[in-house]
Curated annotation (Swiss-Prot):
Amino acid composition bias (Basic and acidic residues), ranges on this chain: 105-118, 128-144
Name by which UniProt lists this protein: Small ribosomal subunit protein bS6
Organism: Azorhizobium caulinodans (strain ATCC 43989 / DSM 5975 / JCM 20966 / LMG 6465 / NBRC 14845 / NCIMB 13405 / ORS 571)
Pfam families for the chain: Ribosomal_S6
Keyword Disulfide bond part of the UniProt annotation: no
InterPro entries, alphabetized: Ribosomal_bS6 (IPR000529), Ribosomal_bS6_sf (IPR035980), Ribosomal_S6_plastid/chlpt (IPR020814), Transl_elong_EF1B/ribsomal_bS6 (IPR014717)
HAMAP family (UniProt xref): Ribosomal_bS6 (MF_00360)
GO molecular function, one term: small ribosomal subunit rRNA binding
GO biological process, one term: translation
Swiss-Prot/TrEMBL keywords: Ribonucleoprotein, Ribosomal protein, RNA-binding, rRNA-binding
Length: 150
């Protein structure tokens, strides 16, 4: 049996529960044909780079599959028939990744939030210094002298 990574996109107006039901149905197709699905990851709703069948967003789902080619072909055939599935892509791999995929790791990184206040200058222009940290020169000195007289 061969190892595959399979990603499919489902229309955005389908509920998350219906996406799970679709994933379970396609997983059942693989298992009925002598294969196994070792990992199912729901990546959630993401924006598409371009419109696919008049949709700008889609539910993304990943399968890690260990199955014969006939099982994967049958699953792809059924996905092609299903109106809710916008696109799918199956890639044969030498070994399956353990742990969360790169997309889930990216989402975890994005969920960390702000980094907060930094102890040093904070970067950017000026390094956190105000103009009062250095002596005035030229035109600035003249403006400062007129400000102090009022």
């Amino acid at each position: 049996m061969s190892l595959y990574e399979h990603v499919f996109l489902v229309r955005q107006d389908v509920t998350a529960q219906q996406v799970e039901e679709l994933a379970a149905r396609f997983k059942g197709v693989i298992e009925a044909n002598g294969g196994t699905v070792s990992k199912v990851e729901a990546w959630g709703v993401k924006s598409l780079t371009y419109r696919i069948k008049k949709n700008r967003k889609a539910h993304f789902t990943l399968f890690n599959i260990d199955a014969p080619a006939a099982a994967v072909q049958e699953m792809e055939r059924q996905m092609g028939i299903d109106e809710d599935v916008l696109r799918f892509l199956t890639i044969r791999v030498d070994e399956l990744e353990e742990g969360p995929s790169a997309m889930l790791q990216k989402r975890d990184r994005d969920d960390r939030g702000e980094r907060g206040e930094r102890g040093f200058g904070g970067g950017g222009f000026g390094g956190g210094r105000d103009r009062e940290d250095r002596p005035r020169r030229g035109r600035d000195r003249e403006e400062a002298a007129t400000e102090e007289t009022f």
